[in-house]
A protein has these predicted regions:
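Mature, structured domains of secreted/extracytosolic soluble proteins
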Residues: 23-334
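Sec-dependent bacterial lipoprotein signal peptides
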Residues: 1-23
């Protein structure tokens, strides 16, 4: 009897590896990614099936975005091909993207990497409240929620307050304008004439879709397993705040000096909780202008959840040149 029991145990032990191997093969087969599932965004761009993107891919790697495209994030990619990127590099005087300062590469490439996953339809008429709206509701302000959050931002800067204190100002990520035909339909204005007035070196090609800032779309909605890719005909240059644009032009210095007389550094609790420790400070600040539009802030609100404001609100400033101010002050006070 003892011998029979021992023999059974030996048989079980001999069969166990076969059973485990069979189970492992079955599990591997069960969890294997089906052939019909799309590749990740990095693989799609690397495949050559939709064009050559070697310079853009090199930039993504330099800027530290490769893992995101490989599946670490859900995103939308605005992808300039090699011809578009070489044109941009030539214009900037660079032989290769590796010749650019890393912070510039990060700022530029990050402007082509959007948070969240948007196909063509969602970018034509983005709805900040989600996709549960009725058809009638979707026609309300159609196309006017046109700005989308990117990974492009400037590093925090240390500024001096009027009292002489040093504060760290945090710069939020840039938003990218995407102009769809619905945007112009809702406003009741001609798309081509108005778009090309603001982008005189670009061509409106969005009659059935959209233009991405200064770029035309060559191919919409290339599918990846972690988002969508929209191929464009040129590199999209990061837009600056109105404040930065004015600051970089001497002829608006008087206007900016007057505007800055209302300037105040405001502590931001939410930003401080999220990011202050990473920069070795207790508090992060935003530079605002009292009751005037906060043209130095990248966002109209620091809450990333306020999609309605973030995707729609923008400012227009009528800024007289310094010579006009001099003439005004001369007439007014002499």
């Amino acid at each position: 009897m003892k011998n029979k029991v021992s023999l059974r145990r030996m048989l079980w032990l001999l069969c166990l590896p076969l059973l485990l191997t069979a189970c492992k093969d079955s599990m591997d087969e069960h969890y294997e990614v089906p052939d019909w599932v799309a590749d990740n965004a990095w693989e799609v761009l690397s495949s050559g099936e939709h064009g050559n993107y070697s310079i853009f891919l090199q930039g993504l790697e330099i800027a530290g975005y490769k893992q995101m495209l490989e599946g670490k994030a859900i995103l939308t990619i605005i992808a300039p091909d090699d011809d578009a990127f070489q044109t941009y590099l030539n214009k900037r005087g660079f032989t290769s993207i590796s010749d650019m300062p890393v912070n510039e590469v990060s700022k530029l490439i990050g402007y082509h990497v959007l948070y969240y996953s948007y196909n063509k339809e969602k970018l034509v008429n983005f709805r900040p409240t989600g996709s549960t709206e009725t058809e009638e509701e979707q026609n309300i302000k159609a196309g006017l929620y046109y700005k989308h959050r990117t990974r492009s931002s400037d590093a925090p800067t240390v500024e001096t307050t009027p009292t002489g204190a040093s504060v760290m100002v945090y710069h939020l990520e840039r938003y990218l304008p995407i102009f769809s035909y619905r945007y112009f339909q809702t406003k009741g204005i001609d798309a081509k004439n108005n778009y090309e007035a603001f982008y005189p070196n670009s061509t409106w090609t969005g009659d059935d879709g959209f233009n991405v800032s200064n770029a035309s779309v060559k191919e919409y909605g290339i599918i990846a397993n972690n988002g969508y890719i929209h191929a464009v005909d040129r590199v999209v240059e990061p837009l600056e705040t109105i404040y930065t644009e004015l600051k970089n032009k001497e002829k608006y210095s008087t206007f900016l000096d007057l505007y800055d007389s209302f300037g105040v550094y405001v502590a931001d609790d939410e930003l401080s909780k999220s990011y202050a420790k990473a920069y070795g400070v207790d508090t992060l600040y935003q530079y605002q202008h009292g009751g005037l539009p906060n043209i130095a802030c990248e966002w109209p609100t620091s809450s990333y959840l306020n999609f309605t404001a973030l995707t729609a609100l923008s400012y227009s400033i009528f800024a007289p040149e310094a010579a006009l101010f001099r003439g005004f002050f001369s007439r007014r006070f002499h």
